[in-house]
Amino acid sequence: MDILWPVFTMGALSLLFSLGLVFAYKKLKVYEDPKIEQISEFLPQANCGACGYAGCRAFAEAVVKGEAATSGCPVGGEEVTQYIADALGVTAEKVIKKIAWLHCRGTHEAAKNRGSYLGISTCHASHLIGGNKQCSFGCLHFGDCVRACPFDALYMGEEGLPVVKEDKCTACGKCVDACPRNLFELHPASQEIIVFCQSQDRGASSRKMCKNACIACGICSRACPEAIVIENNLAKILDYKKIEPDKIPEIEKCPTNSIGRIHKDKNEG
């Protein structure tokens, strides 16, 4: 009998604790909308952060709660947007396809060197000491953006500048974040004209440093003043939609080709 009392006591305590756990589970259980799992499984699982959340699962939770737009996943595009809208029973938002473009034409041949850089071969490291080019606004040529792209949508071209593979670009924005000189921007795929320069130096100085730099001559802004202005010694497109097709030839009279069509050869052919 002496041994039975401890056994009964332990059994009773085990039963009591078990009942307590069951009660706590039911009382403290957090309900999760099954749509979160449904949407999460359909997402690309890139976990790139382009949606503004920590990963695909976090985005799924946010979109189900109404905290994120159905079109918030740029990697998924229209297909994912439509799927999310159908799952939530709402109207799908319009998806504007965007592509990352480099605002620089400072190739090895065009942009003059100011010295030899022997440090760590990254743009961020080179940027800390001003880079090895005379232009302090141009591309540093070390390819941080290429290494940051999770979709193999960038490669370093023979001229020393990163080249975008349009069919692979998802507008995730990783290249935008990777560039220490903010040379990448996400533009609607339909936008054909951009400014291929970010230099804010005075025209004469810019031209000496890089023959493809904007010299703020004003040809483009005079051709289309309602869409293009000159600010801080640099051409700036205020509204691409206001650029009429018949104005494009005038805009492209730019003496340094620092503004113009992205696909000029394709459009001419």
Q: Can you annotate each of these PLM segments?
A:
Residues 219, 229-234:
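Strongly charged, low-complexity linkers/loops
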Residues 2-217, 221-223, 248-269:
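Ferredoxin-type iron-sulfur electron-transfer modules and their immediate structural context
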Residues 161-165, 234-242:
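A generic structural motif
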Residues 242-248:
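Surface-exposed, short loops/turns at beta-strand junctions within beta-sandwich domains
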